[in-house]
Amino acid sequence: MQSSSLDPVASERLSHAEKSFTSDLSINEFALLHGAGFEPIELVMGVSVYHVGFQFSGMRQQQELGVLTEATYRARWNAMARMQAEADALKADGIVGVRLNWRHHGEGGEHLEFMAVGTAVRYTAKPGAFRRPNGQAFSSHLSGQDMVTLLRSGFAPVAFVMGNCVFHIAVQGFMQTLRQIGRNMEMPQWTQGNYQARELAMSRMQSEAERDGATGVVGVHFAISNYAWGVHTVEFYTAGTAVRRTGSGETITPSFVLPMDS
């Protein structure tokens, strides 16, 4: 991902990062990352408010809505790129605990705000060792605990990767609706539409990982939203952390832990 230009307001805030850090890490995450050689630098974020355009689709058409797919992807990408720019300005090695949230903005449902937030960290033992080949900081949505486990296993995070697809699922005919009354029946247009949309979103996420030179994607999750488009138009969104192998790693033996609280 190419960084965007750094916002002047953010530049002023980041100029004080060396004095004291700000982080959304929990106490456990902070302690574990510190033990692994990482120290927090500053909370970094990126925002994009986007106007989502209109695309016509007939009621009986089963298809991806490319205009809406591009709009929601580009808005997320802008937010992520601005967060990346803040981390790179701090000369961070990575961004951990990345969260990418959205909300409706303003009165109309066609305005969406996406916000990316994470904690920029530095690898104190060897600054720059965990950056990407292009020199940018890595980004990961993994928790501090998962991050340390990943490193111990001989892998390192590369980038937060994502894919999406806005899909219109055709309205079934009147006779088909009549045949379903009182019966258990599969709804083929919904089944096929969901399959197509998920596959497109997954393939786009995998393409991002391959572009960044990763060997796999971990912590994958799905989200389904229809924003303000109605029940027959849905967006399938998938995201995860692309990883690369760094060594053989160590064998992590599970241990029994007995909680003392009741």
Swiss-Prot record:
**Does the record's keyword annotation contain Mitochondrion?**
no
Q: Where does this one sit in the cell?
A: Encapsulin nanocompartment
Please provide the record's keywords in A-Z order: Encapsulin nanocompartment
Pfam families attached to this UniProt entry? YbjQ_1
Mainly localized where? other
Q: Where are the transmembrane segments?
A: none
Q: Which SUPFAM superfamilies match?
A: YbjQ-like
Annotated Gene Ontology cellular component terms: encapsulin nanocompartment; plasma membrane
In the UniProt record, the signal sequence range is none
Could you tell me what this protein does? Cargo protein of a type 1 encapsulin nanocompartment possibly involved in protection against oxidative stress.
Hey, which family's this protein in?
Belongs to the UPF0145 family.
Q: What is this protein called?
A: Encapsulin nanocompartment protein Rv1762c
Organism, as annotated: Mycobacterium tuberculosis (strain ATCC 25618 / H37Rv)
Q: Which classification does the entry list for the species?
A: Bacteria, Bacillati, Actinomycetota, Actinomycetes, Mycobacteriales
